[in-house]
Amino acid sequence: MRVRPASVYRYLLLGVCALLGIYTVYSIIGYDDGSHVPIHRPQRHLYLTVSQDRIGSRFGKLAPKRILYWTTIFGATVPSTALSDCPGLTDRCVIDTNRHQLDSADAVVFHAADISKFPLPVSRKPDQIFVFNSMETPDNSGRFAVPDGFFNWTSTHLYSSDAIHKYGTFLIPTQIAESRGFKVQSYYVQPKRLVKTMKGIFGLISNCHTKSKRELALQELGKHINVTIGGKCASDDRLKSICPAGVECIDVFEQYPFYIAIENTVCNDYVTEKIWSRITVPSIPIVMRRRVYQNILPPKSFIAMDDYKNPSEMANHLRSLEANSTAYGEYFEWRQKGLWTSAPWNAPGYRNGLCRVCELLWKAKDNETEVYKSYDNIWKWFDNESQCETDEFVRSWLSG
């Protein structure tokens, strides 16, 4: 039988079209835009970000993931609207606080400091994720005993957590923000605000007896440079009420060239409102240990006590900065030159808290993360990762 050339071409054309169709379907189903944001600290959890296309299309018809908050948070009930500020995820997860709905929950979150107030679940589904949650340090998180292997994921201030739950924002290089299409937030300071009316360091302190012995370090530093303490720990009664409760008092802080941002407890990645609520203050924050901040704040944006042998050496450097406006201004170049900005709140790649837990649950659905791992001893993990200090550094620094 003779085959006409036209028939051959027709069959070839149909074959090519079929192959193209298969390729197109595969591309749509298997596509992953690799949505992640490289930041100055290469942390595992920040890279594992689900493509919003995949969440929106592949799982769009599936029921939302249910996150059950088993405990309160320092006695307060978690609102059902807790996911309302999770762009792209607001309808992908729901928050529940009804413990009778345990069997329907995909993840169950336990706030560490409240665990003792509620009986632990007596059973769990094989595919259920139990999450250990705390924004505070181990010593301020209750240390209530739970069975070994009880928790699958961690959600703490530590950058090594499965789902980071930190204070403040993510500061990132402006170049990276622009490459991701983020709106750049300016931290520019009017030069006249860098001219100070007061000398030395200002601090607003309410905890007068800390584990790190911050008070001893400041007391000794005050022998070499002016250190003004306001709040409950002020020695001058007039300074005790200098800043009313709930007021940031930026106008007071910016009168001084330096301000105290030392935490009550010095632990890895533990950076609270002492920094974040004053990030716009045109003064240089003083911290205790550089290692805690160097991967969280821009380079040369703060001064650490452990950069100096002793209080005298530190005071000499601070006084030299007071006397040299050019050298002092170098600590604000990240602002003035627009080198750093904030990632948009809960943007992909920078999810925080429950938003990150929700995102991870969808990754688990797509078999892209370790779902069924467990922590043998959650408190041992928390202590080892936190590396909290007592007074060893201050004792050594004072004798240096």
UniProtKB/Swiss-Prot annotation:
Transmembrane segments: 11-31
UniProt PTM: N-glycosylated.
Bilayer topology annotation: Single-pass type II membrane protein
tRNA processing among keywords: no
Lumenal topological domain: 32-400
Catalytic EC class: transferase
InterPro entries, sorted: Glyco_tran_10_C, Glyco_tran_10_N, Glyco_trans_10, GT10-like_C_sf
UniProt remark on cofactor binding: Unlike other alpha-(1,3)-fucosyltransferases, appears not to require a divalent metal cation as cofactor.
Deletion phenotype: No obvious defect in N-glycan composition.
Pfam families in UniProt: Glyco_tran_10_N (PF17039), Glyco_transf_10 (PF00852)
Domain of life: Eukaryota
GO molecular function: 3-galactosyl-N-acetylglucosaminide 4-alpha-L-fucosyltransferase activity
Activity regulation (UniProt): Inhibited by Ni(2+) and to a lesser extent by Mn(2+) and Cu(2+).
GO terms under biological process: fucosylation; protein glycosylation
Pathway linked to the protein: Protein modification; protein glycosylation
Notes on temperature effects: Optimum temperature is 23 degrees Celsius. Vey low activity at 37 degrees Celsius.
EC number(s) stated in the UniProt entry for this protein: 2.4.1.65
Compartments where found: Golgi apparatus, Golgi stack membrane
Keyword terms: Glycoprotein, Glycosyltransferase, Golgi apparatus, Membrane, Signal-anchor, Transferase, Transmembrane, Transmembrane helix
Catalyzed reaction equations: a beta-D-galactosyl-(1->3)-N-acetyl-beta-D-glucosaminyl derivative + GDP-beta-L-fucose = a beta-D-galactosyl-(1->3)-[alpha-L-fucosyl-(1->4)]-N-acetyl-beta-D-glucosaminyl derivative + GDP + H(+)
Residues in the Cytoplasmic compartment per record: 1-10
Family: Belongs to the glycosyltransferase 10 family.
PANTHER family: ALPHA-(1,3)-FUCOSYLTRANSFERASE C-RELATED
Described function: Catalyzes the addition of fucose in alpha 1-3 linkage. Unlike fut-1, does not add fucose to Man-alpha-1->3-(Man-alpha-1->6)-Man-beta-1->4-GlcNAc-beta-1->4-GlcNAc-beta-1-Asn (M3), Man-alpha-1->3-(Man-alpha-1->6)-Man-beta-1->4-GlcNAc-beta-1->4-(Fuc-alpha-1->6)-GlcNAc-beta-1-Asn (M3F6) or GlcNAc-beta-1->2-Man-alpha-1->3-(GlcNAc-beta-1->2-Man-alpha-1->6)-Man-beta-1-4-GlcNAc-beta-1->4-(Fuc-alpha-1->6)-GlcNAc-beta-1-Asn (GnM3F6) acceptors.
Name of the protein in question: Alpha-(1,3)-fucosyltransferase fut-3
Species annotation: Caenorhabditis elegans
Lineage of the species this protein comes from: Eukaryota, Metazoa, Ecdysozoa, Nematoda, Chromadorea
